[in-house]
Amino acid sequence: MASTFVSISNRALTLLGAQPITSLSDDTKEARSCNRMHEQSRDQVLRGHPWNFATKRVALAANTIAPVWYYTNAFDWPSDCLRILQVDTVEEWVVEGRSIVSDAAAPLNIVYTSQVTDITLFDTLFVEAYALRLAADIAYDITASQPVMANMEELYTRKLAEARM
């Protein structure tokens, strides 16, 4: 069965021993918690590992407004960029806000993690990590238990380590 935001939420709720939901808009504590946190949890998992399905390459044009001092060029991140993974330049570069500043000439080639919202692109390991991250993020709201929350954090950390293997 294909994953949905509801099925991922229900996996997180099951880990917490809570009742499943039928929709993120259900008028229940569980649905409200999942609805409030699922996008933040998803983006945190995306940032936590260079997932193949979320990795993109792009050549950035220099911004028309140069940095005030030190560096000669600024390059704005793509709008769907969550994390810069690689910048293809021998020049020094730094991230400032949502820009890369450097003396590198345009175009600046980068590899980055994109914000993927199409759930059909998620791989199974990502779905498991996402459910664990969501469980950790909603654990205290659902269970009022610090130990349960800490356990979900630990399980999430282990799942992310598994992804790195």
Explain the meaning of each model-derived region.
Residues 1-36:
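Short, extreme N-terminal leader segments that mark the start of a protein/domain
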Residues 32-98, 122-138, 142:
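Divalent metal-cofactor coordination and adjacent catalytic microenvironments
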Residues 2-3, 7-11, 88-165:
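Internal mixed-charge
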Residues 26-45, 148-164:
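Short secondary-structure subsegments characteristic of cysteine-rich extracellular domains
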Residues 18, 26, 56-60, 115:
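An acidic- and aromatic-residue-enriched active-site/binding cleft used to recognize and process polar
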